[in-house]
Amino acid sequence: GLIYFYQKNYNIFDACLLASHASTNCVQKPGVRYVEKKDFIPTTIFTNGVFDILHSGHLKLLRFSKKLGKELIVGLNSDKSTKILKGIDRPFNSIKLRIKNLKETKLVNKIYVFKEITPLKLIKKIQPDIIVKGSDYRYKDVVGSKIANIILFKKKDSLSTTKILKKINKN
């Protein structure tokens, strides 16, 4: 299993995590059976965020997440929770427009809006196999790390909606 994921260009840590997921799926059912290719593909992948002004960094995260499993679920911060997290002048785009933009990517299977500051309640309800977050997080700090495997997406650029808005306001 490990070699399968490593050959798919996953880093060694993520390859180990996914191989572990596959072997866990195999032994959860009583009796002996061969590991099948479907055992290697986690069913539910979860990521969350504000996704205020959808940019290339968001799209890279969504594409990466979608490749990991069969179903990609996005937890989307409500307008109210976004204001608390990002400031009174946020979100820039309404919840309706943010949902529309995420749907138009054709990468997301389901979108759930959550009103809380963290998506823990939603994660407990969904019970995803894997939670994907940006590499600016540490594994132990990711909400839901006791519920699902965590994979950190390596950000290659420092693009963020906050930086985009600051640049716009500066000009």
Question: Where does each model-flagged region fall?
Answer:
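Conserved post-catalytic alpha-helical subdomain immediately downstream of the catalytic base
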Residues: G1-E36
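Nucleotidyltransferase catalytic core that binds NTPs
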Residues: F13, K37-N171
